Amino acid sequence: MFITSPLEQFELNNYFGFYLFNYHFDFSNFGFYLGLSALIAISLAIINLTPYGSGAKIVPQKFGIAMEAIYFTMLNLVENQIHSSKTVSGQSYFPFIWSLFVLILFSNLLRLIPYGYATTAQLIFTLGLSISILIGATILGLQQHKAKVFGLFLPSGTPTPLIPLLVLIEFVSYIARGLSLGIRLGANIIAGHLTMSILGGLIFTFMGLNLITFIIGFLPITVLVAISLLEFGIAFIQAYVFAILTCGFINDSLNLH
């Protein structure tokens, strides 16, 4: 089956469906790749505890070193970005940030497999994540500081006549931060996928014209390979950016700044 449209790769395709307690459930390519991302992340964590990783070894193998590097990178991120409050330790949120990071990371990496599905290209998914994080951070702030959390919407030293306007601006900005968190991730993944798909299709068509264009076509293939390597780096960067901005939301709720 050939993909005739660059946007066709983002379509949801149901594999099968079933009824449970009078509710209909569908298992689609989105659910498959999202579940596969979670399964790979869990499997790598378990493997890292075995002799093939860093478990039971004073000097871990390359796989263990790579896993430890990612682990301590995220641990340092949480320690630097989420400052402990009087009642809550910032490190207590590390499991959540780590799980969020590896899920997005492997979701981004699986899309680089030919004909793979990009779960993070679904804006409903990325926006759902970001809005859930925003709501959770807001509830955390209310739990820790009660009504004082609304001080986030009122900068100190604001003249009384400007209070309604600035509160509205800060509130809209607060909501926009949550929306932009998901839109940024989804837009970058969509743009990268479309670039590789369109460029790959043009090269394939060009090389199929005749023998001369077939030989010349190997030159733009190097550009496509370079873009693929760039997308590999973007997969890590976008997961890291999502994690660091999530840390910012949590820190603002804990410390009101």
UniProtKB/Swiss-Prot annotation:
Pfam families associated with the record: ATP-synt_A
BP terms from Gene Ontology: proton motive force-driven ATP synthesis; proton motive force-driven mitochondrial ATP synthesis
A GO-annotated cellular component: matrix side of mitochondrial inner membrane
Topological relation to the membrane, as annotated: Multi-pass membrane protein
Keyword Membrane attached: yes
Function: Mitochondrial membrane ATP synthase (F(1)F(0) ATP synthase or Complex V) produces ATP from ADP in the presence of a proton gradient across the membrane which is generated by electron transport complexes of the respiratory chain. F-type ATPases consist of two structural domains, F(1) - containing the extramembraneous catalytic core and F(0) - containing the membrane proton channel, linked together by a central stalk and a peripheral stalk. During catalysis, ATP synthesis in the catalytic domain of F(1) is coupled via a rotary mechanism of the central stalk subunits to proton translocation.
Protein name as it appears in the record: ATP synthase subunit a
Organism: Schizosaccharomyces pombe (strain 972 / ATCC 24843) (Fission yeast)
